[in-house]
């Protein structure tokens, strides 16, 4: 739970800093965060006289790819389903199944949306579930309703667009 809270707090602090820049300071890019769970090797990998403290491993790679995927998915924080299962949060919204750059195995991803009501989050979850189940009637009903509600929400509209381009069991491939 603390890792997800820290990821969201880091994103929010970065965005506040970016938005509150003093006049005359060049604009900064959007803050993005990826969160995954797994084993990692952490330590000093530098030589004598050169400290290079880092973390290595597949979980670190996946978190890095999730961070990069935010740009394409029009989100700020992406959390893998594995990390979300441990997060203990009720504000996470499924953003579908994606194949991350350089990865063969698709990942189900979620994003925090505390700005949405539980009903809105449940509607988005129903859309993703209908697509995953191959229930075209339920999917079209959900997509139509969500388009009316979230027509100006870039991440939700892009989710619908991605799901429209994939079939049951497929993932959206991020390049």
List where the protein language model places each region.
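Alpha-helical scaffold within the catalytic cores of cyclic-nucleotide enzymes
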Residues: 1-33, 37, 58-71, 81, ...
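Cytosolic regulatory/linker segments at or just downstream of nucleotide-handling modules
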Residues: 40-42, 63, 70-132, 136-175
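Cytochrome P450 core scaffold surrounding the K-helix E-X-X-R motif
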Residues: 44-47
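Catalytic tyrosine of NAD(P)H-dependent dehydrogenase/reductases that use a Tyr as the general acid/base
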Residues: 53
